From Swiss-Prot:
Annotated InterPro entries: CALM/Myosin/TropC-like, EF-hand-dom_pair, EF_hand_dom
Key word Kinase present: no
GO MF annotations, alphabetized: calcium ion binding
Domain EF-hand: 46-80, 81-118, 119-154, 155-190
Entry's free-text remark on domains: This protein has four EF-hand domains, two of which may be functional calcium-binding sites.
Record's protein name: EF-hand protein 5
Source species of the chain: Trypanosoma brucei brucei
GO CC annotations, alphabetized: myosin II complex
Taxonomic lineage: Eukaryota, Discoba, Euglenozoa, Kinetoplastea, Metakinetoplastina
Keyword Cell wall biogenesis/degradation listed: no
Binding site for Ca(2+) 2: D132, T136
Keywords annotated in UniProt: Calcium, Metal-binding, Repeat
Length: 192
């Protein structure tokens, strides 16, 4: 029997079954394919550079304090503890930074342009698998609401309602296809 050639793309990782916590995920209904942003225009980079200048209080600088990034997140309703903030930076690809006190413009661009990768997909799916022990790809509306209202960064009732709108649950049996939800969420995040 011939060995299969290794798959070099991320796109089929979850359709073949990924892993959460070192344990394989068996195939569930729906597949996940990463969505990639379109090429970044000069105007987009200019807008991000302006945002970076605002965070640096108008100074032309090569880095900004992480506390400014954390304050920005808090100003838009993302109130994170220091530990949670550092975890967000790690998940969004900033874990390899040597300077954890400042964010360079290059790292700022990476953060703003970050795409959802397999690690993030595994973490999202892992959260749903807590409720989906049978690995059907579905959770109830109650489980979905509980996950976002009580887990990790607790969502407000309004935010949960918005997430439910994105989830488009099946009205007949009150189930939510979390693979479809994750795909839609990824699409929205990657094309913001």
């Amino acid at each position: 029997m011939k060995d299969k050639a290794p798959v070099s793309s991320q796109q089929d990782h979850f359709s073949r079954g990924g892993a959460v916590g070192g344990k394989p995920i068996s195939d569930v209904r729906g597949t996940s394919r990463p969505f990639y942003r379109k090429p970044v225009s000069h105007n987009t980079i200019a807008e991000l550079a302006e945002g970076f200048r605002v965070l640096s209080n108008g100074q032309k600088t090569i880095s900004i304090p992480m506390k400014e990034v954390s304050a920005l997140m808090a100003s838009v309703g993302l109130h994170l503890s220091d530990e949670e903030f550092h975890e967000v930076m790690r998940v969004f690809g900033q874990g390899e930074q040597t300077n954890t006190e400042e964010l360079s413009f290059k790292d700022f661009l990476s953060l703003m342009m970050c795409e959802v990768d397999d690690t993030m997909l595994e973490e999202m799916r892992g959260a749903f698998l807590h409720y989906d022990k049978q690995k059907t790809g579905f959770v109830t509306k109650k489980q979905f609401t509980e996950l976002f209202a009580t887990g990790g960064e607790c969502s407000t009732p309004e935010e949960v309602e918005e997430l439910l709108t994105i989830a488009e649950q099946d009205e007949t049996d009150d189930k939510i296809d979390y693979n479809r939800f994750i795909n839609e969420l990824i699409h929205r995040l990657n094309f913001m």
